[in-house]
Regions:
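Hydrophobic alpha-helical hairpins/lids featuring a short glycine-rich hinge
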Residues: 36, 76, 84-105, 109
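C-terminal ends of transmembrane alpha-helices
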Residues: 10, 14, 47, 75-85, ...
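Generic alpha-helical transmembrane segments
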Residues: 33-37, 174-179, 249-251
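Membrane-interface interhelical connector segments
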Residues: 226-242
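Structural signature of multi-pass alpha-helical membrane transport proteins
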Residues: 5-26, 41-56, 84-85, 157, ...
Length: 251
């Protein structure tokens, strides 16, 4: 996932040159290779050892990392937007739009289903003492729908931009609200039981993601509001006002 983030970051540099873009493409291709290798390895595990798939998705801790598959997927989509769309035709813009709606539907069902299972599945339950920011992971893919929207919306036709932005803001807001509620549980856990074990402490950095991605998504989507379409055309200053509001909220 971090590999894809590096590729996107290299592409987003304001002072760029051909070599930097090439490095970004190489890192992006490397990300795809890693994704395919890891997918093959985990698939081989499930095939060679029957029953491990069921135990993995039903284990209260291991199942929390199922959403990381979709986090990697959205990273790949962002890379396609950064490096593929400028080099291809309109067809890839359409593909990205279709993939956006499919991704949104899949991750929303995943988030609802996984939290429902964690709330109801006996007898193994997660305890407050064992709480880590990994509890946020089931909602993370849904939240990154907003980031996905902010990446692709600038190249979409004006007629589709508003719906993508509304969906992106809604999913980003949902993810942020769930994450914010989880923070209160995590602070309670830290106050009552202290810091996690040393080997678990790097996972605390997961908590940095939701506010950062929310700020990035809001600013990105606000910069692509179709100012000359629909209600924004009737109210000329509305798009600029929403962009300024997004910056204030992000801060």
């Amino acid at each position: 996932m971090a590999t894809g983030g590096i590729a996107t970051l290299l592409n987003a540099q304001p002072n760029t040159f051909t070599g930097l873009t090439t490095i970004g493409k190489v890192v992006f291709i490397y990300e795809i290779v890693l994704f395919l290798c890891f997918t093959a390895f985990i698939s081989a595990r499930f095939i060679m050892f029957p029953g491990t798939f069921t135990s993995a998705i039903s284990h209260p801790t291991e199942s929390l990392f199922i959403p990381t598959f979709f986090l990697s997927i959205v990273d790949i989509f962002n890379g396609i937007q950064a490096f593929g769309v400028p080099s291809t035709g309109v067809w890839l813009v359409v593909v990205q739009r279709v993939c956006f709606w499919i991704y949104l539907a899949c991750v929303l069902m995943l988030s609802i289903g996984q939290y429902t299972y964690l709330f109801t599945a006996p007898p193994k339950r997660l305890t407050v003492q064992a709480m880590t920011p990994a509890w946020i992971l089931p909602i993370f893919p849904t939240m990154l729908t907003g980031t996905f929207a902010s990446q692709i919306v600038s190249t979409q036709p004006a007629v589709h931009r508003a719906t993508i932005i509304v969906a992106g803001v809604s999913m980003q807001g949902l993810g942020w609200m769930v994450s914010f509620m989880m923070y209160s549980v995590f602070i309670t856990r830290l106050m009552q039981h202290g810091l996690p074990e040393p080997n678990m402490r790097p996972g605390m950095f997961i908590a940095v993601g939701p506010p950062s991605f929310t700020s990035l998504a809001l600013i990105g989507m606000s910069q692509s509001i179709p100012a000359s379409y629909g209600v924004f055309a009737v109210n000329p200053g509305m798009a600029e006002m929403l962009e300024q509001l997004a910056i204030i909220v992000a801060m």
